[in-house]
């Protein structure tokens, strides 16, 4: 079992149940999935960009990403319907907790000029989104073998009913919020 999953079950869940004054342990908010998305506008001109992004996300997550396609044509962006424009991965269960552990312990401390995560990036329903400017913060990516620096979006979907519950959950996981 993943280290963070055990910590959640044995320490975080009972503490949150008491803190949020919940009657049942099943009401305690938990992380249900983590979605990593890489939007690749530059893939329009070069098809190799998608292959490199797929390889990078696969190294980071240990899971094969899904290529996303444009839903409709947009002349301003020179995009046609059906063209590949991004890659995404959805992590659940043990892989999700292992990724979260690596993100908090290894990757975030490697971000240049890191002052903490924005505590206001919740969506109103307890889900948290953050952006990473470069994929090289992950130790699985070899700096010498990348073709370009690419950012990615990380979304943590929780069962929390409000932003305050979601914030309490992520603070219990020791998320480094700045404010």
Swiss-Prot record:
UniProt cross-references to SUPFAM superfamilies, sorted A to Z: RL5-like (SSF55282)
Keywords: Ribonucleoprotein, Ribosomal protein, RNA-binding, rRNA-binding, tRNA-binding
Entry superkingdom: Bacteria
Residues in coiled coil: none
Subunit structure: Part of the 50S ribosomal subunit; part of the 5S rRNA/L5/L18/L25 subcomplex. Contacts the 5S rRNA and the P site tRNA. Forms a bridge to the 30S subunit in the 70S ribosome.
HAMAP family reported for this sequence: Ribosomal_uL5_B
GO CC annotations on file: ribonucleoprotein complex; ribosome
The keyword tRNA-binding is annotated on this UniProt entry: yes
Protein name as catalogued: Large ribosomal subunit protein uL5
Family: Belongs to the universal ribosomal protein uL5 family.
Short name of one Pfam family: Ribosomal_L5_C
Record has Secreted as a keyword: no
UniProt GO molecular function: rRNA binding; structural constituent of ribosome; tRNA binding
Function: This is one of the proteins that bind and probably mediate the attachment of the 5S RNA into the large ribosomal subunit, where it forms part of the central protuberance. In the 70S ribosome it contacts protein S13 of the 30S subunit (bridge B1b), connecting the 2 subunits; this bridge is implicated in subunit movement. Contacts the P site tRNA; the 5S rRNA and some of its associated proteins might help stabilize positioning of ribosome-bound tRNAs.
GO biological process: translation
